[in-house]
């Protein structure tokens, strides 16, 4: 008999904003969350939440939980804030992807799923802006 292990696929969703990085690993359908971690869960100070180091630690934490539950391969979906917010992922996106790759996962595809408006979107605050 061959000693090949069974490959179980999952989705890793990385939401990287300017304020935090959230990593969620789900099964392939997306119906069940297998593990979840964020930059705020692994560092003490609030100012360190968006840092690349916090994203790396959060990705390692989520990866270890997913490995324990049997996930061995992932598709990565990266998302920025989108809409009227930033359309480029925050500083934690790249280190999170790198940490998931180094954790030993087989990586299928990496895609950007940031919601982009096709015309424009009205910013909050109304016509005269936010009055402070």
UniProtKB/Swiss-Prot annotation:
Gene Ontology cellular component annotations, sorted alphabetically: ribonucleoprotein complex; ribosome
UniProt keyword annotations, A-Z: Ribonucleoprotein, Ribosomal protein, RNA-binding, rRNA-binding
Keyword rRNA-binding: yes
InterPro entries in alphabetical order: Ribosomal_uS11, Ribosomal_uS11_archaeal, Ribosomal_uS11_CS, Ribosomal_uS11_sf
Record flagged with keyword Ribosomal protein: yes
One Gene Ontology MF term: rRNA binding
Superkingdom assignment: Archaea
Coiled-coil ranges (or none): none
Gene Ontology annotations of biological process type: translation
UniProt cross-references to PANTHER family, sorted A to Z: 40S RIBOSOMAL PROTEIN S14/30S RIBOSOMAL PROTEIN S11
Subunit note: Part of the 30S ribosomal subunit.
Annotated family: Belongs to the universal ribosomal protein uS11 family.
HAMAP family on file: Ribosomal_uS11
Biological role stated in the UniProt entry: Located on the platform of the 30S subunit.
Name of protein: Small ribosomal subunit protein uS11
Gene: rps11
């Amino acid at each position: 008999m061959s000693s090949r292990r069974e490959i179980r696929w999952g989705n890793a969703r990385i939401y990287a904003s300017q304020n935090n990085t959230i990593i969620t690993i789900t099964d392939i359908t997306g119906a069940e969350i297998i593990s979840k971690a964020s930059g705020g869960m692994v560092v003490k100070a609030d100012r360190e939440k968006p840092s690349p180091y916090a994203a790396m630690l959060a990705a390692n934490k989520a990866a270890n939980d997913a490995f324990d539950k049997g996930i061995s391969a992932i598709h990565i979906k990266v998302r920025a804030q989108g809409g009227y917010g930033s359309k480029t992922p925050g500083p934690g996106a790249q280190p999170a992807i790198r940490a998931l790759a180094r954790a030993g996962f087989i990586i299928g595809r990496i895609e950007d799923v940031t919601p982009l408006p096709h015309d424009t979107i009205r910013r909050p605050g109304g016509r005269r802006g936010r009055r402070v």
